Amino acid sequence: MRLLHAMLRVRDLDASLGFYCDLMGMRLLRRREYPTGRFTLAFVGYCEENQGTVLELTHNWDVRDYELGDAFGHVALGVDDIVATCDRLREAGANLLREPGPMKHGSTVIAFVEDPDGYKVELIALPRD
């Protein structure tokens, strides 16, 4: 068994693709519209689906908003240069929720940004070799 994907429901698929692909560096792996079901699925990631876990972005055509609730935490992405990544995101107008710095009660350097739908994305500084 292996983890294939995690799914996020999104209001504006183009805005979400812009965030995850253009700003976060993922690739659009596949996109398919389902007219009879009135939804579109887009799969994005850093690798092919058969090589690792990806994100499924689901856009339901007739839904204008979602209640995020408080059960879901965040998506985490490893980044090589967390300061440069946060600078680039800030310049692009992304909502940085937490500036880069050590996590509470630890030394791992993290930051948080919000995607267009309000999902939290944790950025984790990858160890330098």
Residue ranges: model-predicted function:
Residues 7-52:
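Core segments of cupin and vicinal oxygen chelate
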